[in-house]
Structures are given as C-alpha cells and as structure tokens.
Amino acid sequence: GKLPVTFYKDTAELPEFTDYSMKNRTYRYMEMEALYPFGYGLTYGTISYSGAKTEQETSAVLDDVTVCTKVKNESAYPLHESVEVYVKYKNAQPDEPGFQLKGIACVELQAGEEKEVSVTLHARDFAVITEDGGCVVRPGEYEISIGGQQPGERSRALTGRETVILTVRKEGNEENVEY
C-alpha cells in the first residue's frame, strides 16, 4: 500500500500549534526532507513506467488535461499498483503549495502484463486558493508528475524509482472555479 500521511524525521520539525501558517504542514508545504513522504510505498515486485505523455500540451484555462503512461509488471506474480498524479503551478508563490496529489489510478497487473493508464485532470485540479478565499485557475505552465510515488529526492532515495514530470500550458485569463 501507499502512505496516506507524511512521517516527519523528528517531532521537533512539526510546526507549533499556535502557528497557523501552512509552512511545513502536510507534504504540499514541506520544506524539509520527510522520513517517509506521503504516497510512499513498496511492492513485492518490480513495476516499470514508460511512455508518459499528455494528450494536450496546451489548453484553455478551464479545459481538462488527460495524462497517460504505460505500467508494466516486471515480476513473476500478480501485483496491484497505484499510479499517482501530482500537479504544481510552475510559478507558484513561496506560500503556495508544491506538488499536490490530484489523481490516482489503481491497476491490477498479471505477471509480465503491461497496461496503459489514463487520468483526466479537471480545471479544479489546477486551481489555487487565493488570500481572500477564492478558487482560481491561472494561465501559465504547470508541472504534472506521474508515477508510483510523490515526486522528489526522498521518494527516489527510498524506492530507487523516478516519476516523470510533464509540462502543460494553460492559456487564457485567470478563471474562478467552484471550490
């Protein structure tokens, strides 16, 4: 399975209860290295990813974006894999979140089997919450990570695997979306 929480290395790294800023809270705002990051998990065999792509590299701000990848079970026995899709606004402000889990696809693979997996991201998946509580999608570039874990150095060190980072561009004006 995959972790639904982040494990800090030490309790001293946890923010004070009286500090309500998001800095270092949850995997989305963490600046230090986690002991075990959100989404981390191992399996009894080897899973490989290949051919990651988006169906559209440029789209209107409110359009859906579909990402696809091939997932292969390199083992001699059946496995389940959770394909994780994270999104990050490339020009995010320092107080805005980094990569956020926005899609997941669970796939069952027989020994040696390969399947193509698609995840569709909607406008809300690209949105950010503003200071005044609005929910907006901005034009600009977004990074989409697809793989079996959260993107980042610690995940790589623990699993020996990389995620693929794709870039898509949203064009048009900033748009409000439902929270």
Range-by-range predicted roles:
Residues D125-I129, Q149-R154:
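Short acidic/polar inter-strand loop motif in beta-rich domains
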Residues P78-V85, P97, T130-D132:
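Short, hydrophobic/aromatic beta-strand segments
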Residues G1-H80, Y86-K88, P139, E143-G147, ...:
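Secreted, periplasmic, or luminal enzymes acting at the cell surface/secretory milieu
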Residues E55, G103-A105, G133:
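Short, conserved secondary-structure segments in the cores of folded domains
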Residues Q93-I129:
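Intrinsically disordered, low-complexity Pro/Gly/Ser/Thr-rich segments with frequent PxxP/GP/PP motifs
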Residues D125-E141:
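Short glycine/proline/serine/threonine-rich loop/turn segments at secondary-structure transition edges
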Residues A105-V107, V117-L121, R156-E175:
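Generic detection of short hydrophobic beta-strand segments and adjacent strand-loop junctions
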